Amino acid sequence: MTASDRRLMLSTFSALVKALDKANVTYFMYGGTLIGSVRHHGPIPWDDDLDVIMAYADRSKAVSALSVLSPDFKLYKPPESQTSLLQWKLYSSSAVPRSLLPKPYRWPFVDIFFFDENSTHIWDVEKEYYDAGFVWPKGVVFPLRKRPFGNIVVPAPCNFVEFLTTNYPGAEMAQCSSPTFNHRLDMHRLPWRAGNIIPCSHLWNVFPFVFRDRTADGSVVESLRIGNWTLQTVRMPPVVCSGK
């Protein structure tokens, strides 16, 4: 991914966040993007797309919010008859087609997944992920809290560590996995979850990583460092994950 590709991806993400926040859509960082915020205060350095998940009930509100971004950004929605790969994609109008086969969207994009809910849990509506256990108690997710992501703050699950370790054991800090999907070409590099895994500590002097210290009042100080060089420090206040 080139520097200009990354800038375009981040500007698309920033536009999406601003639009969804303004429309009061319930959404939060998801998948590798949440891992990126927790571990790097931004994208995973070797990732090539960004992900959010939003309330299935907010689809109409989201369409109205994101349509305001046209003509600078375009929203792809799969056909209503489609029963899998249900996520939407937001991409810049200045992005160029690069996939090996013609696609109705362009890279870099932001993937928009959906969750449904009952009184106690939420779950990813995509069958593949639901079957893989992407189901969480509301007490893990709500109330949402804002987390750093580059130069913006974005909603995240209340207990983001428990949320991640439900489906990505070791993802918070200890293990770093190579990507298994090439989003630029829209094709798998490796089977899902079959990437090379190394201890993240092997990369501490190469990429920025977040380190945490808890204070006496229950706050958590997050320091973003490369080796011994501190890039930024953020204080995260204590929060009660009530499920509401």
Name these PLM-found stretches.
Residues 1-26, 36-46, 54-244:
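The feature captures the alpha-helical scaffold/lid subdomain characteristic of nucleotidyltransferase
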Residues 29:
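A short acidic/basic microdomain associated with nuclease active sites
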